[in-house]
């Protein structure tokens, strides 16, 4: 398992969590990940889980990283006026079965820790951001089984 993050504190937290869950010996944690590194995982069954706050539009490009064609990916998308969900998923249509999953509203009544709060505070506690961040679920048509 590989994890990458540009934030040193996040890398340290990842290592602590891996240790607490008994998987520290199965994870490598490094800093920034370059598109050329995808080639390292060719020939292996690979699932890429990615939430990189908009950088997915640059990093995850099959034209730059042909290895992506055989990987399955789950990517949180951060579209804006310059980057659309359709633009991102279109680049994978030849190599992947593409599914876009829209986030759903969460019920604050399901979380006991929120029940003592006023209703508006409960609602705000569950809002991560103002804009929806859908997931792209990309299943390779050529994945290694």
Task: List the model feature ranges, each with a label.
Residues 54-64, 84-85:
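A short, conserved alpha-helix within the catalytic core of class I
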Residues 2-4, 30, 74, 99:
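Hydrophobic/aromatic beta-strand patches that form the interior of the parallel beta-sheet core
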Residues 4-57:
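S-adenosyl-L-methionine
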Residues 8-9, 55, 79-80, 142-144:
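Short, solvent-exposed loop/turn segments at secondary-structure junctions
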Residues 69-80:
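Conserved beta-strand signature within the Rossmann-like core of class I S-adenosyl-L-methionine
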Residues 81-145:
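Rossmann-like AdoMet/SAM-dependent catalytic core
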Residues 41-42, 62-70, 91-93:
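Short, conserved loop/helix-junction motifs that constitute active-site signature segments
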Residues 1, 47, 72:
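Hydrophobic "anchor" residues on beta-strands that sit immediately upstream
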